Design a protein with these regions (language model features):
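Short amphipathic
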Residues: 4-15
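Amphipathic, hydrophobic secondary-structure cores in small proteins
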Residues: 21, 25-81
């Protein structure tokens, strides 16, 4: 079961209002489609990306760099999907 490698890299918050309700909803919806553990860290705080409450508590403003950590059997696909949301500025429609 330890065949998978954890993935870690930086993502940048680009929405003008930071991580607010709409991007958080997209993150949670995307993350829950994967079995991997997915978290974001910012300013000494860590959030489970499958929890809207955790993500709200991060308080990440526009321009913030967050550390994305993904660990699990589908980590590469999960990391790619979450990264795509950040890179697109959350412009994808659900």
């Amino acid at each position: 079961m330890s065949d998978h490698q954890p993935i870690q890299h930086l993502v940048k918050v680009t929405p003008e209002n930071g991580l607010h309700l709409a991007p958080i909803a997209q993150l949670v919806r995307t993350a829950t489609a994967y079995g991997s553990a997915i978290s974001l860290s910012f300013d000494g705080k860590r959030a489970d990306v499958k929890s809207a409450f955790d993500l709200m508590l991060l308080g990440a403003p526009c321009g913030a760099e967050l550390t994305l950590d993904v660990n699990g059997p589908d980590a590469p696909a999960a990391a790619a999907a979450i990264t795509q949301l950040f890179e697109s500025g959350f412009s994808q429609h659900p």
